Structures are given as C-alpha cells and as structure tokens.
Amino acid sequence: MAIKTYKPYTPSRRFMSVLDSKDITAKSSVKGLLTKLKATAGRNNNGRITSRHKERGAKKLYRIIDFKRNKYNIEGKVAAIEYDPYRNARIALVVYPDGDKRYILQPSGLKVGDSVIAAEGGLDIKVGFAMKLKNIPIGTVVHNIEMHPGAGGQLARSAGMSAQIMGRENKYTIIRMPSSEMRYILSECMASVGVVGNEDFINVSIGKAGRNRHRGIRPQTRGSAMNPVDHPHGGGEGKTGTSGHPVSPWGTPAKGYKTRKKKASDKLIISRKKHK
C-alpha cells in the first residue's frame, strides 16, 4: 500500500503523510454492525483523570468485529474492504449464503470476491481461513489468536502483525509472538491464517498536532517543565536535567523498569521478548 506525501505549502504539511485509500471499496458501512461506544476520555466513574493525555477525539462508531470466527463450515465471500476508525488495520465485510454479514480483520492479500471459511477441523492453508491451532502446520504465520478456547482472538490483531507456530507439546502449541516472546497456547484455540494487512501504517508520519487531537491524544507536558510540587523532575533555574534516573510523576522508574505483576500464566511463557 502506497504512502502519500504532500508539498510543503504549510509547515504542518511538510512532514505529514497518509496512507493511500485505494484499497477501500465500501462507500458506507453495514448499519447492523455499528454501535456506539461511550468515550471516557481517560476518566473513571468519579470523573477523575486516571489516564493522562486522553480526550474524546473525533466522533466515530464502533464496528462489531467477528473475532471468534465461530460460523463453522460455511463459506463466505468478501464483499467489501472498509476503513475502521477504531483500529489501524482494514476490515473485510464477509457475506454468507444465509444472508449473515460479519466483519473480520483483513489479512494481507485478501481481496473482494475471495472466499473465507472457519472450521474446527482441518482446512487448506489459505489467507483468511480460520481453524484450531492443532490443525495448522508448524511454521505457518497466523493472526487473531485466541488465548482461551471460544473467547475470541486477542493476539496479533494490529496492522502488519503476525505470530508463527513453532511446535507442539502435549495439549499446547508453541507460538512465537510479534514481540519475539515464545509461549504456550492451548491447541484448541482458534487462529486465522496470514498477516494482518495495512502493513505500511507504521511508516505514516502524523506531521501535525491536530491529527493526534482527532485521534483522542492530548499534548504531553515534560516533567522538567513543571514545578517541583508537580513532578520529581520539576524546578531549577533555567533548563536543568534530572537528578538520578527518570521517573514518572509518582516516582516509578520510567525507563526499563518492569511493572508487570506475576501471574499464574507466567508458567506458559517459555522465553521473554528479546530487547534490541
């Protein structure tokens, strides 16, 4: 997919780039698959900010995506490729012979007119097909992977993401995650074949603050620009550096410090991600 750049007729246009939208074929979405989501803007039920630098952003409707792929053994046709304002991947509208319509994540290479199918048993290894991990050959790249059978895909759903099946052991399948982490996942879990499309999204330059405001991202104030009462990095005459290691406003080390709590699922992780 091509990336469009612009002549610098304003300062903000100089570095701005956007994705070419020629791959989008739909002019409107299916009304029955649209719903509203309450925008919390980073506030909790008391109205207090719990996640900074968030706002409502542009108005948008949520597209209901079929992450479970539980319409088994019925072949569907891809009727349209659509833009989804809630995610960086494109979505594909699949129409089934009984009239049912569902959105799925568009894997790279899936086009209008192609057929997709999901099954609990084995299938041909084609882009967009969904089946249980135990039926997918070792070495295959997959996306939209379940962590618990029937719960719906949770892993490798972002644009350009995929995981690879590395092996099997008892009731588990060994998966190499996009982060290079190796972990066990139950072989009864479903996954879709292929790489999530729209791979060039990572190369897009936002270019100006307004685009981030439309996405619901507010400006971030540096701690060193604050007063000492507001941040551990604050205060000092003129521009001063930090004393000691960089920390968050609440004193947690900001770089390289692991904050993940120990979980029962730690035993399913074979090796952690490799740091660059």
From Swiss-Prot:
A Pfam cross-reference name: Ribosomal_L2_C
SMART domains named in the record: Ribosomal_L2 (SM01383), Ribosomal_L2_C (SM01382)
Record GO cellular component, one term: cytosolic large ribosomal subunit
Bias type Basic residues, positions: 257-276
Classification via PANTHER family: LARGE RIBOSOMAL SUBUNIT PROTEIN UL2M (PTHR13691:SF5), RIBOSOMAL PROTEIN L2 (PTHR13691)
Function: One of the primary rRNA binding proteins. Required for association of the 30S and 50S subunits to form the 70S ribosome, for tRNA binding and peptide bond formation. It has been suggested to have peptidyltransferase activity; this is somewhat controversial. Makes several contacts with the 16S rRNA in the 70S ribosome.
Subunit architecture: Part of the 50S ribosomal subunit. Forms a bridge to the 30S subunit in the 70S ribosome.
Protein name: Large ribosomal subunit protein uL2
Gene name of the record: rplB
